[in-house]
Regions:
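Metallocofactor- and cofactor-centric catalytic cores in central/energy metabolism, strongly enriched
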Residues: 1-153
Length: 153
């Protein structure tokens, strides 16, 4: 099969024109709003969830159990959801691969839809909790907490 023995069913040439329609302005004096959650840093989330985020795939099971237990004990009162975010990364990663994982996790931890975040590490992974914490920069210490399972009694 090649271009000599195949044929297209397309005929002619279609011209495309982009004609955007202007959006009418809101009448003055009418303010727009939505029900959201303002965070201390000024960002606004549309959800108020508790996120349990592992720094390494080795603690995925623990993060699931922590989220399940929290859902059972609180009945989800006052929050939209309690969610664990498992992944298979953070251990034995190097270079750009390791940095990309850290950036994705950082962006999740700092996301305004998370009203509270528990970052869970193992303690021996490449993506160490201490170094990851430094990567967050200035963060709300009341909203974001850390746990290393190898250091917990």
């Amino acid at each position: 099969m090649n271009e000599k023995n195949i044929k297209t069913n397309l005929e002619g040439l279609r011209e495309y024109e982009f004609n955007p329609q202007p959006i009418p302005e809101q009448p003055s004096g009418k303010s727009l709003s939505f029900k959201g959650y303002r965070r201390k840093n000024g960002e606004v989330g549309i959800r108020n969830e508790i996120w349990v985020i592992p720094t390494v795939g080795c603690v995925n099971g623990i993060t699931h159990r922590l989220a399940d237990r929290l859902r059972q004990e609180t009945q989800g009162t006052g929050v939209d959801a309690i969610v664990a975010f498992p992944h298979n990364y953070g251990c034995s990663q190097l270079g750009d691969d390791h940095e990309n994982t850290r950036k994705i996790l950082r962006d999740m931890v700092l996301h305004p839809n998370a009203g509270a975040v528990l970052v869970v590490g193992l303690g021996c992974e490449n993506n160490q909790v201490g170094a990851f914490r430094e990567m967050l920069g200035n963060y709300d210490t009341e909203r974001i907490r850390f746990m290393e399972t190898q250091k917990v009694d």
